[in-house]
Amino acid sequence: MRPLLPLFLAACAFAAPTAPKKKPEPVKPLTPAQKSDYAKVVQPMFDAQCVSCHGPKKEKGKLRLDTLEATLKGGKNLAFVIGRPNDSMLLARVFLDRTAGDVMPPKEEHPLTEKQKEALYAFVEGQPIPDELAKAAIADTRKALTAAKTTPKPKK
């Protein structure tokens, strides 16, 4: 019976849960152009549609989207991994079907438009946001701000 003990301990070691994975670092630092895209396209989008739940007053999921540094840091799950859109949890949630439980913005909020999603994807991918796409995303963000100001919130 004694010879089976090392085998049993080895099996337990492989079956034990592994330590949580460390959050991956961005592939490379942001360029000045990427920082500019963030400031003119992405941050206004977040300010209009995300910061009320992910900002200084409220940090759902321990995620803040009110600054570039906070956005890149992420929350419980990493928000963005620049250069690796498939590893970016927030991006995945933005592209979920509107009926999915984890969709962002939540179902009861105004969804991001396709142009906003495309701009966000380009940013996370590490690519410059093309001018026409940036203009369309900015226009959609302005519409979302107007809608948020004029649409009454349902009482909870």
What are the roles of these predicted feature ranges?
Residues 1-4:
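Positively charged n-region of N-terminal signal peptides that target proteins for export
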Residues 7-17:
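Hydrophobic h-region of N-terminal signal peptides that target proteins for export
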